[in-house]
UniProtKB/Swiss-Prot annotation:
Cell surface receptor implicated in modulating innate and adaptive immune responses. Generally accepted to have an inhibiting function. Reports on stimulating functions suggest that the activity may be influenced by the cellular context and/or the respective ligand. Regulates macrophage activation. Inhibits T-helper type 1 lymphocyte (Th1)-mediated auto- and alloimmune responses and promotes immunological tolerance. In CD8+ cells attenuates TCR-induced signaling, specifically by blocking NF-kappaB and NFAT promoter activities resulting in the loss of IL-2 secretion. This is Hepatitis A virus cellular receptor 2 homolog. Interacts with HMGB1; impairs HMGB1 binding to B-DNA and likely HMGB1-mediated innate immune response. Interacts with BAG6. Interacts (phosphorylated) with PIK3R1 and PIK3R2. Interacts (not dependent on its phosphorylation status) with FYN. Interacts (in basal state T-cells) with VAV1; AKT1/2, LCP2, ZAP70, SYK, PIK3R1, FYN, SH3BP2 and SH2D2A. Interacts (in activated T-cells) with LCK and PLCG. Interacts with ILF3; this interaction promotes ILF3 ubiquitination and degradation. The keyword Phosphoprotein applies. The lineage of its organism: Eukaryota, Metazoa, Chordata, Craniata, Vertebrata. The gene is Havcr2. Glycans are attached at residues 74, 100, 147, 173. It comes from Rattus norvegicus (Rat).
């Protein structure tokens, strides 16, 4: 019974100690750069730790399908120049940048930080998905099934991340779906149409106002000229009342002369009969 105790202890020692292992998902488009973060805290200034990057899950030791490896100071192996470490190497930033990714770069990647001591490595697993760019299908040319571009996030190198969103352009019937960009375009066209209408209405009102002012000014000037002409005509014509009065006075004097002559002739009728009239025989 006791002979099995050393053997059981040996089996326990051979089992791998638990290491920190996380899996994160990242997405990039074909032809873009993919950024897979991995870092550690440097134990002391100038004391760096070897790391390895491999494609596939982290094995018990080292990395499977190694794409990049470092020692304490330099990169000792690189599968291709597409695999680069662009972080601060001396501050423990071992993030991997894969340039110009293809669909074959999809999969799980293992970042293994090889701290001194048995079974003391720190492992980090990251899942990379590579997608193709969305294809824009013109309206009216799609028949049958359409190409759908779901929103995707592209993480680029650096301290932050850059997000690019692609939207669905057509449904299954080939009908164009209104996107945010289309709504902005339609809104811009509506605004421009409203501005044109407003400018046209304003110009029409201004023209009507100018014509009204000109017509009113012309009418006032013509009315004033007519008034001045009437005053001049009245000033040049003789007064009709005075003319009529003079004519009436002359006729009255003639009648008086006629009456006086008739009276004179009637008083001397005993001597002879004579009738004098101032009127000429017809």
């Amino acid at each position: 019974m006791f002979s099995w105790l050393p053997f059981s202890c040996a089996l326990l020692l051979l089992q791998p100690l638990p290491a920190r292992s996380l899996e994160n998902a990242y997405t990039a488009e074909v032809g873009k750069n993919a950024y897979l973060p991995c870092s550690y805290t440097v134990p002391a200034p100038g004391t760096l730790v070897p790391i390895c990057w491999g494609k596939g899950s982290c094995p018990l030791l080292q990395c499977a399908s190694v794409v990049l490896r470092t020692d304490e100071t330099n990169v000792t192996y690189r599968k291709s120049r597409r695999y680069q470490l662009k972080g601060n190497f001396y501050k423990g930033d071992m993030s991997l940048t894969i340039k110009n990714v293809t669909l074959a770069d999809s999969g799980t990647y293992c970042c293994r930080i090889q701290f001194p001591g048995p079974m003391n490595d720190e492992k980090l697993e990251l899942k990379l998905s590579i997608t193709e760019p969305a294809k824009v299908i013109p309206a009216g040319t799609a028949h049958g099934d359409s190409t759908t571009a779901s929103p995707r996030t592209l993480t680029t190198e650096g301290s932050g991340s850059e997000t690019q969103t692609l939207v669905t352009l057509h449904d299954n019937n080939g009908t164009k779906i209104s996107t945010w960009a289309d709504e902005i375009k339609d809104s811009g066209e509506t605004i421009r149409t409203a501005v044109h209408i407003g400018v046209g209405v304003s110009a029409g009102l201004a023209l009507a106002l100018i014509l009204g002012v000109l017509i009113l000014k012309w009418y006032s000037s013509k009315k004033k000229k007519l008034q001045d002409l009437s005053l001049i005509t009245l000033a040049n014509s003789p007064p009709g009342g005075l003319v009529n009065a003079g004519a009436g006075r002359i006729r009255s004097e003639e009648n008086i002369y006629t009456i006086e002559e008739n009276i004179y002739e009637m008083e001397n009728s005993n001597e002879y009969y004579c009738y004098v009239s101032s009127q000429q025989p017809s």
